[in-house]
């Protein structure tokens, strides 16, 4: 089970609630393998290279957020950017070619939240998964 949110910038964060049964280095290695598989399968679309000058028009898969001490913007945070964009939890069906994270702003989000029938992250705290099953399913077992 995973959940998605905008970053308040151009990106998205995928959040997967996990049991504390692996250490940070194991988790980072796992997420790096997933990201590298995407980058290898579609090198014209994805990259794991953090250097902006090397990305061109590719999507940067930032597995580096999965390390002890790394930070990621919290949900519902207003970013210090033009338009006062917000890091907003969204439903997976909202992740499509029409998604425009810049429309989630301090001005627009209160109305959006009032109109939502469900919290996209409802039940998140009930999920605690291991990465072992995902590793096996993806052929990434250590």
Place the predicted regions along the sequence by residue.
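Short beta-strand
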Residues: 2-8, 49-53
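Short, conserved phosphate-binding/catalytic loop or strand-edge motifs used
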Residues: 6-16
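Generic "edge-of-domain/loop-turn" microfeature
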Residues: 11, 21-23, 68
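C-terminal accessory nucleic-acid interaction domains of nucleic acid-metabolism proteins
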Residues: 25-142
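Catalytic palm subdomain of template-directed nucleic-acid polymerases
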Residues: 15-27
